[in-house]
A protein has these predicted regions:
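Hydrophobic, helix-prone linear segments
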Residues: 1-37, 43-45, 202, 221, ...
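Eukaryotic intrinsically disordered and solvent-exposed regulatory patches
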Residues: 38-42, 155, 309-310
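Core alpha/beta nucleotide-donor-binding catalytic domains of modification enzymes
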Residues: 135-265, 270, 280-284
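Short polybasic/polar patches that bind polyanions
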Residues: 43, 160, 296, 437
Length: 485
């Protein structure tokens, strides 16, 4: 084993690895950048006090290499830190030549990576994540591009209606115990393809997908303006009993840890903005606090809000937690609108003939008995929130209380209308159960559309004048053709 004496006062015997790495901030002094490394590790690699060395640019890329050389133009110094009781002496290397730094470092460099070997130190700039993202977005004719993950397809259509182009979709419906032998893993993905033409469809479990492969696929496409993440909400939702939440934690089926692969997706896609949609309880969870902190560390400005559907002209009482993180400061959530106070009944009457009578069903009786049944009445101004489990006829399903004392079960067409989903949105050849599930677990369309539109405007406001002019000219050139007929 090699040993080394760090200095005369502090003698330390230590194993010397073949390689030692560090990451340090680019130093500044008097308004000028300086590459400075002050470390006990320098003598380990032959850079003792007084040793001379060369400084040369790395060929073909940013960075520089320092090599010990008796005739080198620079030498290693030592510093003494009087305030330190532990290791007050450190050796130091500094490169301050402006011409060399301009050749070796990009203008946006903030941090440097040092790879130390015996007699050699390779210094490379660490990629400035947010600077690179901002630069790529500002150069686009239209930055409204989306990667939509964990979606049944409704929010895909919503992004399209808000002016976004859909570059990529990651959607995989996990098999549930009730599915038995019926494979439903492609149902949401098929619905997405009925409503968008993405460049890439990833029909893989977010917990198992190869993120390096996702990174490679993302690099083949355009920069992503918005990454949308509708994390599974079951284990945060008040609709799921606490006993079942605890059971899912014990048996490993809980979805509370989905925030981790979602962060990995942000890391490989490098979007300009990130949107999360979930139930309000998610915003108070430890998982969200972790998510928020890491995005902040990565250079995103993170904002969140609880949005309520009635305040955005929608017909249900759906309340949702939203987070929008952006590499561009200044995003603002859409302001609330006046809440409607007129009865909902007149708007839904045309759907009632197709809603089946369930007056004598056990689920209704049980729901009424325990107070969990959620009713639309002739005086209701809004519908209760539609749930993923609606079609199963659970105790907490939404029922319609008719004026004659009977009860009806909402048709899928009515559920679609209540959630504000356009009536021309196709669901393909899905079963009614899957169609209801997609509708119930989706979004309050008008509210979500207003947020997508706000994100789109936020992205377009960052464009450089030249790209804005190109986009405007392109629109003007296309207008005559629109009226050719």
């Amino acid at each position: 084993m090699q040993t080394v004496t760090v200095n005369a006062d502090i003698v330390a015997s230590a194993h010397i690895p073949s390689i030692i790495t560090k990451e340090l901030k680019l130093a500044t002094s008097a308004g000028r950048n300086r590459v400075r490394v002050s470390s006990n590790f320098l003598p380990f690699m032959g850079f003792e006090e007084g040793v001379r060395h060369t400084v040369e640019p790395l060929p073909g890329t940013y960075g520089m290499v320092l090599r010990t050389d008796a005739k080198g133009p620079q030498k290693v110094y030592s510093r003494r830190y009087a305030s330190r009781r532990n290791n007050p002496f450190e050796t130091q290397i500094e490169v301050s030549n402006s011409a060399m730094l301009a050749k070796c470092l990009p203008s946006d460099a903030e941090r440097l990576h040092f790879e130390m070997r015996r007699g050699q130190i390779v210094i490379r700039p660490v990629d400035n994540r947010t600077f690179s993202i901002r630069k790529s977005i500002r150069g686009m004719d239209d930055p409204r591009t989306a990667f939509v993950a964990l979606t049944g397809g409704v929010d895909v259509r919503c992004f399209r209606d808000a002016g976004f182009s859909i570059d990529s979709i990651l959607e995989y419906r996990p098999q549930e115990a009730r599915d038995k032998e019926n494979d439903k893993t492609e149902t949401g993905a098929v619905n997405c393809l009925m409503n968008a033409a993405p460049r890439v469809l990833i029909n893989e479990d977010i917990f198992r997908v190869d993120m390096d492969r996702v990174r490679a696929l993302a690099r083949e496409g355009v920069p992503i303006g918005c990454l949308s993440l509708s994390l599974q909400c079951d284990d945060f939702s008040s609709a799921k009993a606490n006993s079942l939440k605890q059971k899912s934690l014990r048996d490993g089926t809980s979805s509370r840890n989905m925030a981790y692969p979602a962060l990995r997706l942000v890391e490989v896609v490098n979007p300009a903005t990130v949107m999360i949609e979930n139930v309000p309880a998610f915003g108070a969870s430890a998982q969200y606090e972790m998510f928020r902190q890491i995005l902040t560390d990565w250079g995103y400005e993170v904002k969140d809000a609880i949005m309520e559907a009635p305040e955005h002209s929608d017909l249900t009482l759906r309340k949702r937690f939203y987070m929008v993180a952006s590499v561009f400061p200044g995003f603002e959530f859409p302001e609330a609108l006046e809440v409607a106070t007129d009865p909902l009944w007149a708007k839904i009457e045309r759907f009632l003939p197709d809603c089946r009578d369930v007056s004598h069903s056990k689920s209704l009786a049980d729901g009424l008995a325990c107070g969990r049944a959620r009713l639309i009445t002739p005086s209701s101004t809004h519908s209760p929130t539609i749930l993923k489990s609606q079609m199963r006829g659970a105790k907490d399903s939404v029922f319609i209380a008719m004026p004659d004392g009977t009860y009806r079960f909402p048709s899928n067409e009515l559920l679609q209308f209540l959630n504000g989903i356009p009536d021309d949105m196709p669901f393909g050849r899905q079963s009614k159960d899957i169609e209801s599930e997609i509708i119930g677990q989706s979004i309050s369309y008008g509210m979500h559309h207003r947020l997508c539109d706000a994100i789109g405007q936020h992205l377009r406001a960052q464009q450089q004048p030249a790209t804005m002019l190109r986009a405007t000219q392109g629109l003007q050139l296309s207008l005559p053709g629109m009226f050719a007929h």
